[in-house]
From Swiss-Prot:
Keywords, alphabetical: ATP-binding, Chaperone, Cytoplasm, Nucleotide-binding
Subcellular locations according to the entry: Cytoplasm
Entry's Gene Ontology cellular component terms: HslUV protease complex
Database matches in InterPro entries: AAA+_ATPase, ATP-dep_Clp_protease_ClpX, ATPase_AAA_core, Clp_ATPase_C, HslU, P-loop_NTPase
Domain of life: Bacteria
Keyword Chaperone carried by entry: yes
Molecular function via GO: ATP binding; ATP hydrolysis activity; peptidase activity; proteasome-activating activity
Record-given protein name: ATP-dependent protease ATPase subunit HslU
Protein's organism: Aliivibrio fischeri (strain ATCC 700601 / ES114) (Vibrio fischeri)
């Protein structure tokens, strides 16, 4: 789990997301509180529940991007889901409990990777030994048994050195590797996912779990495959499962996007029961319940839930009161200005302008964005957002793609040339489209 301070988390988010300081502070505090809770005495720890967050703001202002970046920073089981993918129990579609099952799968995979990383050095040594046994078969005595002392012979050590230096990488050998398990795909009816998971496991066991097959491959590929195989042997699956369930229960973070789409708007008179039903199904998860997964029972009492929505067709007060009460921290994200667009184009790591410069550099075309050119792009995107539908920073992608379309198409024929994207160039490519509202609606 991440031990970063709130200030460090915000600083890291600043390098990818422009503005939205309130939202960044809220998620940073929530993430740090996960660490603080684990430092408490066990009796008090069980009483401290996470303060779930509701992020409100128009589309394209950074809600989803905050979730993506948080997932990388958290170093904890994290899952992002769309609320619209789920339906009420009894309707065709996914049930909300599958969120916890998927999160547990993420935790199992994450814990397994961490455990394998810890034994990587030993696993590599074992893999090297297996390859050296193929390259230099051990000498046998009269009874066919391996003679001792061969492992430390000078020739073997010389080959081990060459192997580590990569001098044998392209040599082909025949090696015994674990045969891939034959997957049995079973379509699960709603609510029966657990049973189908068990059936799949049963069929895989029947097909033989630990069969090996001989494969011819280069030593570099064999070393990778055998290291993974040896690493899996050195970890205890039961311990991993226990650790993963502990992690998911105490550090798990669930990000639910588009929560406003399951609100029944105040002007809505349709009989859309399943929308409100999804909210009611979410209640026990957010409040704390026990969910059955193929890895065991998982409690959701101390998981952190972060929800977000644009709330253009509905209001936060349209959520059912019980769910509103379980999302105590409200954060409003602000709409982006032309200045924000200008910063988005230049400040974040791997900004849009950086990406286009790097992409065209692969064709030996040098692209340079001037200060006034970037300002004009930002103003154009902001103007189109104001006159048509406001889609936030996503408009920049559309505008930039339109702006760079010609040079991207001709780049392969302009080897060694340069392009300066200034205000005049931007106006010549976008001026007419931005000025004509009807064209903007269809093209930008």
């Amino acid at each position: 789990m991440s031990e970063m301070t709130p200030r460090e988390i915000v600083h890291e988010l600043d390098s990818h997301i422009i503005g939205q300081d309130k939202a960044k502070r809220s998620v940073a505090i929530a993430l740090r509180n996960r660490w603080r809770r684990m430092q408490l005495a066990p009796e008090l720890r069980t009483e401290v529940t996470p303060k779930n967050i509701l992020m409100i703001g128009p589309t394209g202002v950074g809600k989803t991007e905050i979730a993506r970046r948080l997932a990388k920073l958290a170093n904890a089981p994290f899952i992002k889901v769309e609320a619209t993918k789920f339906t009420e129990v009894g309707y065709v579609g996914k049930e909300v409990e599958s969120i916890i099952r998927d999160l547990t799968d993420v935790a199992i995979k994450m814990t397994h990777q961490q455990a394998v990383e810890k034994v990587k050095f030993r696993a590599e040594e074992h893999a090297e030994d297996r390859i050296l046994d193929i390259l230099l078969p051990p000498a046998r005595d009269a009874w066919g048994n391996n003679e001792e002392g061969n492992n430390d012979s000078g020739t073997r050590q010389s080959f081990r050195k060459k192997l580590r230096e990569g001098k044998l990488d392209d040599k082909e050998i025949e090696v015994d590797v674990a045969a891939p398990q034959v997957g049995v795909e079973i379509m699960a009816p709603p609510g029966m996912e657990e049973m189908t998971n068990q059936l799949q496991g049963m069929f895989q066991n029947l097909s033989g779990g630990n069969t090996t097959k001989k494969r011819k491959m280069k030593i570099v590929d064999a070393l990778k495959a055998l290291t993974e195989e040896e690493g899996a042997k050195l970890v205890n699956p039961e311990e991993l499962k226990e650790q993963a369930i502990f992690n998911v229960e105490n550090h798990g973070i669930v990000f639910i996007d588009e929560i406003d789409k399951i609100c029944k708007g105040s002007n809505s008179h349709s009989g859309d029961v399943s929308r409100e039903g999804v909210q009611r199904d979410l209640l026990p998860l957010v409040e704390g319940s026990t969910v059955s997964t193929k890895h065991g029972m998982v409690k959701t009492d101390h998981m952190l839930f972060i929800t977000s929505g644009a709330f253009q067709m509905a209001k936060p007060s349209d959520l059912i009161p019980e769910l509103q009460g379980r999302l105590p921290i409200r954060v409003e994200l602000e709409a982006l200005t032309a200045d924000d667009f200008k910063r988005i184009l230049t400040e974040p790591n791997a900004s849009l302008t950086e990406q286009y410069i790097a992409l065209l550099a692969t064709e030996n075309v040098k692209v340079e964005f001037t200060e006034d050119g970037i300002s004009r792009i930002a103003e154009s995107a902001f103007q189109v957002n104001e006159t048509t539908e406001n889609i936030g920073a996503r408009r920049l992608h559309t505008v930039m793609e339109r702006l760079m379309e010609e040079i991207s198409y001709d780049a392969s024929e302009k080897n060694g040339e340069s392009l300066i994207v200034d205000a005049e160039y931007v106006s010549s490519r976008l001026g007419e489209l931005v000025a004509d509202e009807d064209l903007s609606r269809f093209i930008l």
